[in-house]
Every structure is written in structure tokens, then in C-alpha cells.
Amino acid sequence: MLLQAEHISKTFGAKRVLDDVNLGADSGQCVALLGGNGAGKTTLLRIVTRLVEPDSGSILFDGHPLGQADLRQVGYLPEERGLYRNMRVGEQALYLMRLKGLGRREAEAALRSWMPRLGMDGWWQLPTRRLSKGMQQRLQFLVSVAHNPRLLILDEPFSGLDADGAAMLTAQIQSLRASGTAIILSTHNLQAASALCDKTVQL
């Protein structure tokens, strides 16, 4: 099992958000995380990416405790937008990729090889402030996958996408899964979950 999160619990104030939750994904597997608003989906994904510490439980990556070095092998698409409006698309993508530890030349080559696959030809010089919500989603997906992570975590990836954007994203997720990437995604879209994933976890 590539990722094993076991007995995860988390409380914020008086609210118990997660209570003894288990989540796992292996290479080439897609796991859908289901649940209503407030069920703890985003909190669990943020715990798996070490953005939030659990109150209890363990997270193993490839058989050992998940550490900072392992996070370079993880791609994360957050539900909230974390983009700088005054940057251009290419500049912004390079900045975010370099935060993952890639050199400028390596990062730019990776980004430029991925952009045509996401329908982003000609986007390099676009101001980020001109991007629609769906275009912002494509940009953040680009940054989450361009470094070829072994584990891809997607929080509501279809949010803000039109039909064409959703179809493109579905095709890319299927391709990544076929190439051996482990994928965990949260979604309200049961049709997408059943089409893409072979396992579901209900919160």
C-alpha cells in the first residue's frame, strides 16, 4: 500500500471532525472520499498532506512514516484557490513548482510538456487575474501533476469546471491512474466517483 492513514482523529474546539478514520491507496488505484459539507473530507486530505496535524493516528508512505521528503512525491490540488492574481500564469506555475524543490529549468520543462495536455497552449504570459474559476482550476491541477507525483490528492477537482473541462480532467485522471499514480479525490459528484474510482470511503 503506497499510502496508509490509520485511526485518524481530529477535533477543532468542541467539534470532533474526524473520529478513528482509515484511508489507504495503492499505486494505480483511485479512491473517492465522499461525504456532505462538514464531514471532514478537506481536513482529512490536509492531514494526509501534512498541512494539519492529527490529534491521533499514523500516516505511512510506502511503508514508512510520511515525512517532508516524501511530500515531493505527492501532488495536492486544494479546494480553495491559492493563486497570486498579479503574476502571469507561467511565472506563477514556476514559483509553485520551485516550492516543491525543482530547479527552474526542470520545472519549466515539466510545465511546458504538460500544458498542451490540459488545453493550456498560449497561457504562459496570461495574467492570472484574467483567468476564470475553471481556468484557475486547470492551472492548479497543472502544478499538482507536472512533477509526476506517485500520489495525487484532489479536493473537489471538478469544482468550477464546465463540461469540456470536466471531460479533460476525467481523461487526465484516468491516464495518470493507468500509469500507476495513486489518486485520492473528494467529490460531491457521485457519477464522477463511480466512473473514475474503484474504491470509496464514506465520511
Regions found by a protein language model. Name each.
Residues 34-36:
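The feature captures the beta-strand-to-loop junction immediately N-terminal to the Walker
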Residues 49:
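Helix-to-loop junction immediately C-terminal to a conserved catalytic motif
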Residues 57-70:
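Conserved ABC transporter NBD signature motif
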Residues 94, 98, 106-123:
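Conserved ABC ATPase "signature" region
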Residues 152-155:
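Catalytic Walker B motif of ABC-type/P-loop ATPase nucleotide-binding domains
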Residues 163-165:
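Helix N-cap at the start of a conserved alpha-helix in ABC-type nucleotide-binding domains
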